[in-house]
């Protein structure tokens, strides 16, 4: 049975799952779905369009699924999706999508620490850790198992590949490919592989060595990027990791450039 504090304001059209806990003074609009066994702390606002999964933990001051901060937004119906078992800490703000994609997505098993903001149409994968006060502009894409350090500022449309780590207090408008560490106060730069993260996730020494060799060609050979990628296609066994790296570089959009070598 769900437990809803008498001071909470729940829209008559909201769908509340089994064994949900909702704290004092929380407000939930009509067009909202809350999954089973999710716990919502006091003083949370969940606006129309939110689709929250099961076993999430939403802490005080969080504001979810409010209108996108986009001058082109004209009130069209859009949504925010949050997967299962995601923890949303104090004062996190997640805007719903615009007509560009119709939705903002935050996956499952994520930790969004206090004061994180994800703008409209962002897509955040699974098993992602985003530290305090990280700010994502609209349309960002974050792969699975990414870690973003506190106070980082991520420009709109930036993509961060799987298993990457972005350093704290960094900011950038460049795409960050999978498996790497990136940082920099003016522009993201390549700072080596996320070796500790890869080992924790079960990557073998051979896999890590291959990934390192690929990025040496891409970032440290002195070749133009197009020539470096061709060398990787020609000279390396096309393992899943190599294919993922090449696929990431092949799928860039919006004229977005990739992070720079650390010595540039």
UniProtKB/Swiss-Prot annotation:
Reactions catalysed, as given in the entry: a (3R)-hydroxyacyl-[ACP] + UDP-N-acetyl-alpha-D-glucosamine = a UDP-3-O-[(3R)-3-hydroxyacyl]-N-acetyl-alpha-D-glucosamine + holo-[ACP]
Annotated keywords: Acyltransferase, Cytoplasm, Lipid A biosynthesis, Lipid biosynthesis, Lipid metabolism, Repeat, Transferase
Self-association and partners: Homotrimer.
GO terms for biological process, alphabetical: lipid A biosynthetic process
Entry's localization field: Cytoplasm
UniProt-recorded name of the protein: Acyl-[acyl-carrier-protein]--UDP-N-acetylglucosamine O-acyltransferase
Family to which the UniProt record says this protein belongs: Belongs to the transferase hexapeptide repeat family. LpxA subfamily.
Any one GO cellular component localisation term in the record: cytoplasm
Organism classification: Bacteria, Pseudomonadati, Chlorobiota, Chlorobiia, Chlorobiales
Enzyme class: transferase
Major subcellular location class: cytoplasm
Record-linked InterPro entries: Acetyltransf_C, Acetyltransf_C_sf, Hexapep, Lipid_A_LpxA, Trimer_LpxA-like_sf
One GO MF term: acyl-[acyl-carrier-protein]-UDP-N-acetylglucosamine O-acyltransferase activity
Pfam families reported in the protein's UniProt record: Acetyltransf_11 (PF13720), Hexapep (PF00132)
Role this protein plays: Involved in the biosynthesis of lipid A, a phosphorylated glycolipid that anchors the lipopolysaccharide to the outer membrane of the cell.
Domain of life: Bacteria
Pathway assigned in UniProt: Glycolipid biosynthesis; lipid IV(A) biosynthesis; lipid IV(A) from (3R)-3-hydroxytetradecanoyl-[acyl-carrier-protein] and UDP-N-acetyl-alpha-D-glucosamine: step 1/6
E.C. number(s) listed in UniProt: 2.3.1.129
CDD domains reported for this sequence: LbH_UDP-GlcNAc_AT
Primary gene name: lpxA
